[in-house]
């Protein structure tokens, strides 16, 4: 087994370990949480992370790690792990099944491996640079279900997820810009999905169930996963500073990008 094979296996195992904790709490109705004006923190975040960290640290004690709850662990070498024990905390606390445990691994700052496990549905995505995306073990691509959105570039029937970073609602100017982006998309596509679980909806894009994904000031915990799932699934992507767009094909990307450029912000 190569180093990258082992990293991929450990990332998947860590995501599954966190997911097992979340699944047990979700089924028991244990969604205890502290609610703020713009965010929510569930006890399950800490519990799931406590299951994930030993998997990673036990296998690679010298690697740098950022865990959403525990913070930074210094390390040597080119690898850095990003652990998000509960992506979609608001949905989890509300009893919605759209949440996941995710792990990303960067090599020299670039996404190398991503693993996402959705406990409520038992779905697992694993992506690796140069190796594509696997959904429950099978290779998938963003173009697999293109017909759901019509012909290439025909976004009138498209479903597009919009993801904003945690700082956006706290800043009136950024919040207004995000609203303008949503409004512009709403006038152009069939459905704008306001995503509170970026890794879940990134997986849907990776297998063509969504036609587009828009991220505005994305959070680090999810962005590495999103980028790797999109690129390895063959999605068309474009970034300009704090705006990132991925789509099932180049024509759809061009239409979405043009729509966002014309937004009143």
Over which residues does each language-model region extend?
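DPxDG-like acidic metal-binding loop motif
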Residues: 75-137
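N-terminal subdomain of lithium-sensitive/metallo-dependent phosphomonoesterases centered on the IMPase/IPPase/PAP
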Residues: 1-86, 261-265
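Residue-level signal for inorganic ion chemistry
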Residues: 22, 45, 56, 89, ...
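Short helix-loop capping/hinge motifs at secondary-structure junctions, enriched
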Residues: 132-135, 139-141, 251-255
């Amino acid at each position: 087994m190569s180093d990258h094979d082992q990293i991929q296996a450990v990332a998947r195992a860590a995501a599954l370990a966190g997911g097992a904790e979340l699944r047990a709490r979700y089924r028991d109705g244990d969604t205890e949480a502290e609610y703020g004006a713009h965010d929510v923190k569930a006890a399950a975040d800490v519990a799931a992370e406590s299951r994930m960290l030993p998997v990673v640290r036990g296998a690679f004690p010298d690697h740098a790690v950022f865990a959403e709850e525990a913070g930074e662990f210094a390390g040597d070498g080119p690898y850095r792990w990003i652990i998000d024990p509960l992506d979609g905390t608001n949905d989890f606390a509300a009893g919605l099944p759209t949440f996941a445990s995710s792990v990303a691994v960067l090599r020299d700052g670039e996404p190398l491996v991503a693993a996402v496990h959705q406990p409520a549905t038992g779905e697992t995505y694993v992506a690796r640079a140069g190796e594509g995306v696997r959904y429950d073990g099978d290779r998938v691509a963003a173009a697999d279900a293109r017909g759901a959105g019509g012909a290439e570039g025909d976004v009138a029937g498209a479903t597009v997820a919009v993801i904003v970073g945690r700082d956006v609602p706290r800043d009136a100017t950024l919040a207004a810009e995000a609203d303008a982006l949503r409004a512009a998309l709403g006038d152009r596509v069939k459905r704008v999905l306001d995503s509170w679980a970026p890794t879940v909806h990134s997986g849907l894009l990776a297998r063509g169930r969504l036609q587009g994904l828009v991220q505005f000031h994305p959070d680090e915990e999810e962005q590495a996963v999103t980028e790797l799932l999109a690129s390895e699934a063959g999605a068309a992507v474009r970034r300009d500073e704090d705006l990132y767009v991925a789509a099932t094909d180049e024509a759809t990307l061009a239409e979405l990008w043009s729509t966002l450029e014309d937004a009143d912000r």
